[in-house]
């Protein structure tokens, strides 16, 4: 693997290299679209045929539609983070399908870091939007309106671990699926290097997209829940 070989040369972990490479691809794609939009036609007309810009615009429009439905009227404020997460995960997944490369999402450090970022982000949104009410919701029904307020400590003990478990589910789901997918492709490329691996690489493309979609979708759902008024 190229990143593993470079690790011994430059002294930087292959995971960090793969993550930086995915981020650079995302940045390059953004610059390409920006350059096309700033062109003579002002970006009003789509490119002819299939192009990077057209694909990215379709994906962004599709994500925006989902974000509008799941994050409410203020979705535009938080959509850049959701979009960045989606494309970073997608590019990191796709890198793992390229012979000689390994995707950053095949390592728990990357998936756990992404999950923690998502958790911190939607928790901060909840606190900013609702203040102390967001924290109090972990204590069950409103204390002044419930005859079971004495159960509040028990609700707190249950709800906080449940909320933190989202970090583990996000991280492990992405890691398990991408590690298994990349392993299957690598094994078949070793056993039968011609023909058969192409089938699994095609399936790998689908898996890479679906896992990025699921990660982004769950991020939207968690943000939407954080934006809801506490009851």
Report residues per predicted region.
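Selective transmembrane helix interface/packing segments
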Residues: 1-231
């Amino acid at each position: 693997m190229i990143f593993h070989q470079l690790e011994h040369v430059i002294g930087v972990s292959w995971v960090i290299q793969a993550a930086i490479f995915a981020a650079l691809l995302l940045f390059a794609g953004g610059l390409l679209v920006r350059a096309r939009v700033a062109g003579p036609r002002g970006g009003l007309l789509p490119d002819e045929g299939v192009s990077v810009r057209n694909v990215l615009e379709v994906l962004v429009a599709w994500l925006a539609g989902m974000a509008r439905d799941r994050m409410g009227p203020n979705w535009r404020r938080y959509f850049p983070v959701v979009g960045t997460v989606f494309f970073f995960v997608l590019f990191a997944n796709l890198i793992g399908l390229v012979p000689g490369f390994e995707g950053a999402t095949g390592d728990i450090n990357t998936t756990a870091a992404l999950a923690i970022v998502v958790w911190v982000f939607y928790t901060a949104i909840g606190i900013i939007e609702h203040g102390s009410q967001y924290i109090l919701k972990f204590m069950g029904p409103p204390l002044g309106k419930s005859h079971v307020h004495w159960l509040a400590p028990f609700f707190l003990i249950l709800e906080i671990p449940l909320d933190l478990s989202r970090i583990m589910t996000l991280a492990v789901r992405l890691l398990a699926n991408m590690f298994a997918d990349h392993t299957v492709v690598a094994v078949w490329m070793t056993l039968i290097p011609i023909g058969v691996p192409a089938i699994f690489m095609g399936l790998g493309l689908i898996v890479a997209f679906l896992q990025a979609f699921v990660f982004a979708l769950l991020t939207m759902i968690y943000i939407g829940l954080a934006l809801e008024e506490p009851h």
